[in-house]
Each structure stands twice: as C-alpha cells, then as structure tokens.
Swiss-Prot record:
It is found in: Nucleus. Pfam families: Ets, SAM_PNT. Keywords: Activator, DNA-binding, Nucleus, Transcription, Transcription regulation. This is ETS-related transcription factor Elf-5. It comes from Mus musculus. Residues 161-242 bind DNA. One of its GO terms (molecular function) is RNA polymerase II transcription regulatory region sequence-specific DNA binding. The PNT domain acts as a transcriptional activator.
Amino acid sequence: MLDSVTHSTFLPNASFCDPLMPWTDLFSNEDYYPAFEHQTACDSYWTSVHPEYWTKRHVWEWLQFCCDQYKLDANCISFCHFNISGLQLCSMTQEEFIEAAGICGEYLYFILQNIRSQGYSFFNDAEETKTGIKDYADSSCLKTSGIKSQDCHSRTSLQSSHLWEFVRDLLLSPEENCGILEWEDREQGIFRVVKSEALAKMWGQRKKNDRMTYEKLSRALRYYYKTGILERVDRRLVYKFGKNAHGWQEEKL
C-alpha cells in the first residue's frame, strides 16, 4: 500500500527515484534538488511549525534531527518514502513507517505522535524522551514478534535499565523498598507511590542524575501508557501494570 501511495501521490517525478536510495544521499544528488524548488531561504525551521504544516524540507530536517539525537541508522530510511509534506507524513500509519524505515520506523512513528500530542515540549528532557522511545520500540517488537519476554532481571540488585522494570523490581524487593512503594491490589497489578521524592532520588542515583525529581519521573512513567506497559488509574500516585508488562505477577502453584 505504501509503495503505491508514495509513487503515485507523493512523488510526481518518481520515475527518477531509486527506492533504495538513503534519504541522506539527496543533498549530494542534483537530480533531486527540484523537489525543493519552492523552498526559500527564509523558510522557518521545523520546530516552529506544527507537523501537519511541514514542508518537504521540514520533514527532512526532522529526520536528520531524529537520526542525530537518537542514533538512528539513516541508511535504513528510504528517501522516496519521505519526500512528502507534513500532512502526508502525519497520515502515515505505523505499519507504513515500518515499511519505509524498518526498525527505525517504530521510533519515528512514536516521536511524531508525541510531537503532535504534546508539542515540542516532548523534547524538553532528552533523558526521559530517549527512555520513552526505547521502551516503546522494545514493547512494540515484543508485541509484533509474539515472543513473551522471560523475567530474567535480578529482583534484589535493581539493575534494570528501564524505569518500569526498576519500579517492578522495587515492589518485589521488600528489603530494598523501605516503604517507598506498596501494592494496592497485588492481583490486578495496582500499586501506589508512597514516598515520591525518595523514589525519584533512588532512580536518579541509578541513572547518575542528581537532578531527578518526581515530576520528571512521573512524566517518564506516563510514557508507558502509550505502550501498554502501564495503565492509567484515576488516582494520584497510583499506577497499574498493563498487558505488556511482565514479571510482576505472583507465581501460581
């Protein structure tokens, strides 16, 4: 579907386009400069415009930023699929992003949807943004592959690299918990943060970030609503493990 839409709608000069050409090669290939013939020197940078109003140049600036900021492999991203306007980009489905950019498509789709819903404040905390993006891709890969991850993390060392796993392991480690977290409904996976700043301090020490606050930590936790790792609970400081979280259930005999 994506190919047919791309070649018939997005690219009027598609016959000259190599579909395997990385988009980064565009700037060194004069054949493709006409795509930007209406671009002027005074055009604004992509962060000053809502994604639906991006020009083709804005789309490319955004791709360049994502590759630089999140270490994505630009060679995986096909130029032909992204020689489009912001409105066309926003209409692409997650499956089309994956078809156009492979595993990078997972990340790009997540970033774009967060920009559309949160604005550019999404990038205010690079550490939290990278955590959210990585966990989104991890959970998506888990879902699409159909492979259930094994609970191979140590419950006492709390060395988990993801925030939600850190919280899970802390709940399962009373000797480390010290009353910071407590179960409200163990069977349903519902828990409460009792000592919010203590939790933030412990996570900050884990990540070597002495500026960590609960406000930042809770923002990172909310990213997990999008991935199905956590579910929203309409009570302050209360969270629930979602369908894509694993390792928190009590073992049934």
